[in-house]
Amino acid sequence: MLRVSRTKLGRLSPSLSRGLHHKAVMALRREDVNAWERRAPLAPRHVKGITNLGYKVLIQPSNRRAIHDKEYVKAGGILQEDISEACLILGVKRPPEEKLMPKKTYAFFSHTIKAQEANMGLLDEILKQEIRLIDYEKMVDHRGIRVVAFGQWAGVAGIINILHGMGLRLLALGHHTPFMHIGMAHNYRNSGQAVQAVRDAGYEISLGLMPKSIGPLTFVFTGTGNVSKGAQEIFNELPCEYVEPHELKEVSQNGDLRKVYGTVLSRHHHLVRKTDGVYDPVEYDKYPERYISRFNTDIAPYTTCLINGIYWEQNTPRLLTRQDAQSLLAPGKSPVAGVEGCPALPHKLVAICDISADTGGSIEFMTECTTIERPFCMYDADQHIIHDSVEGSGILMCSIDNLPAQLPIESTEYFGDMLYPYVEEMILSDATQPLESQNFSPVVRDAVIASNGMLSNKYKYIQKLRENREHAQSLSMGTKKKVLVLGSGYVSEPVLEYLLRDDSIEITVGSDMKNQIEQLGKKYNINPVSLHVGKQEEKLSSLVATQDLVISLLPYVLHPLVAKACIASKVNMITASYITPALKELEKSVEDAGITVIGELGLDPGLDHMLAMETIDKAKEVGATIESYVSYCGGLPAPECSDNPLRYKFSWSPVGVLMNIMQPATYLLNGKVVNAVGGVSFLDSVTPMDYFPGLNLEGYPNRDSTKYAEIYGIPSAHTLLRGTLRYKGYAKALSGFVKLGLINRDAFPALQPDANPLTWKELLCDLVGISSSSKCDVLKEAVFKKLGGDTTQLEALEWLGLLGDEQVPQAESLVDALSKHLAVKLSYGPGEKDMIVMRDSFGIRHPSGHLENKTIDLVVYGDVNGFSAMAKTVGLPTAMAAKMLLDGEIQAKGLMGPFSKEIYGPILERIKAEGIMYTTQSTIKL
């Protein structure tokens, strides 16, 4: 059984008893804060001691209280609903504000001493009703040590819970352990039953029944107070050995599997001065900001389970930050080799029991408490999300804020033993009289938070804390995060919509498209600014200087100009486009400025990178290698909207799409570098796709794929290809344009503004070398011959009106004129939708020799009268990365793409909430 000291009950302070007041009445109110609160501040034997002194004790009826009402009645208590007769009302947790009675003395845990915002309404009501509030938390002795607390039982319940949770988590990771037979603390009638279950588990451990592949288990206890001691009482029932913190590394790797290892951590074990690595306790108490914690590097990497019982104070180092968690969850080389049925742990740190329940405190990523009914959650540091399942990636977390309620009878008796010596002086409290007139001991007097309608002198600081917080809140409301979005095209809307969900973000949109920014200004709460980035560099610089972040949705050729302005003003930057050589040249300047510039955050490039890196990183975690990677992606009209010769439609300028087929491409195929020539040989590189057969797709290679062996970290790949998807027939139709010379960026004087207008018929006559006055039949015959006798290509030209009398748009070049024409002919009509299709294929060679063929499919449709599929899949990942930068989720500095888990992890999770879903499928070849 637990070694819990009990106070011998007898008469209370004689001096107080001699002053017995015949009207002094005490009441135990029932707890109503939540369904699990079954404790009371006093047990029946304490009530008996009080009634024996002649005091009247009222007991408010409660079927929820763990100790039955009749036990209190036997002890002399009077069971009744109305407790208004009492001058002292005792409880454990706060009462509802509407149930407070004026000019009474109340004692409970108020959680007001830090000006906790959630309880300031309660404090205001206490002041209004001139209630005297005694807070158990502030009942301390002359050394400042609490004399009334449930801490030991929080430690007891907490470690029982986390042992149960570890059993579940280890099972999810593929391991049955003796911890499976330990239940939650409240499943036991008393701690003795729980201790027996722990002993049984310990017996199995001592027999060597722990899985070998998980290695020795280590438990780290922070703090030396009652919480830590209570947890250690239970831990000691296991076959345990305590070691010094510096010995953890050795035992975590080479320890005896027939025992578990524990270490008790004090400040001097992990806190060091930043300048010289020394710990000075006196200096630390005065200047904690001069110190850092080495817990993340010296202790945590060798910890299986952390039992945290310390609170975090401002300016003190945290035990673990989110970045620490990312590092700790990175797969390391296990000292024990695992096999498929007996895997090694993905990382050493399996679980954290944060008994302090201090949200956002010493464990930074513990941002919300768990509950007795839902005791566990998993923190996935890569994606920075918390989920309820014990499966998947992450650290198991247990952070229940009312742990002693799980062992309510023993907690009540333990707490009552400590409170009992002070009860009589509290009974004699008369809240109608000045506090100074009361004959209180220092322990009780110093715990009075409020009396006679005002805060006690010792706690007047609470009002100052409230004022400071309110001032800070008003400042934060007035200080918004400023974002400059450059560009007002179709991608900008989902970016604006996503970011403006956060009221603390203020967006300025800069564009030279007056109509577009005016429309955006009507729809969204933005500051529209007329700006031509290429021609107004000074205006761009002044705008950038006032921002926290710049998002460039401009053509890629303008990104270096924007980046230079960001570097000069040390402002972070985001873009969806490729990191071009011109942008890459600024890498050193970006690093020197200490800013973050992230590119390739859209769809392709963007989501394709993220899906690839997630798969590659997971393969590496299990020791597999990537033998092949093929990725095709395309933005297309929905099938029902593809009824034109190109099987394609444009939602933005077609120039980039048209010029793409003129560019050469390089890829790796079965170990050989293949150079695909663009232009007239473009069709030679087009391949029919055998997936999604109902879509009848074709694809062709895009840009230089070979460089991704280094970017993705897959030098083992013998095949690397990234390409573009289109409906079958697209390539052939565009090949006709190439044959005629229409896809040409050279200046064409006949289309300049000062030239005479031309019709398409006249232009085509010129291109095929016949008189502009030739009849249509003659032109068709000449064009047909130029096309090599391809009827399909000729019909495409006719359908598009390129052999008729429609005027050619004025333009700098032939391709610009064709682009303007197609933008009108092949634009999306009302109610028409687009779609994007992506297929990533991987060949993954596992250590066993098996080859896994894995595919990832992403298919997204546009919304009728809403965002297009392309706008969503480009804009939303870009906006998410922007929000992550603003919120401090991305800490890395420099020029980068979305290749790290810090970036791609959260985005791949968050796009699902926006309806962007991808599916995976794998087959294994022996």
From Swiss-Prot:
Spell out which residues are annotated as carrying N6-succinyllysine. Answer: K93, K138, K274, K286, K333, K458, K523, K535, K584, K732, K761
Which residues are recorded with the post-translational modification N6-acetyllysine?
K48, K56, K93, K128, K138, K286, K458, K523, K535, K584, K707, K739, K761, K780
- Provide the binding site for NAD(+): S488, D512, Q516, L554, A576, S577, L603, D604, P605
Main localisation, per the record? mitochondrion
Cysteine pairs bridged by disulfides in the record: none
Q: Where is the transit peptide?
A: 1-27
Alphabetically sorted, this entry's keywords are:
Acetylation, Mitochondrion, Multifunctional enzyme, NAD, NADP, Oxidoreductase, Transit peptide
What is this protein's record name?
Alpha-aminoadipic semialdehyde synthase, mitochondrial
Q: Which organism is it from?
A: Bos taurus
Lineage of producing organism = Eukaryota, Metazoa, Chordata, Craniata, Vertebrata
Encoded by which gene?
Answer: AASS
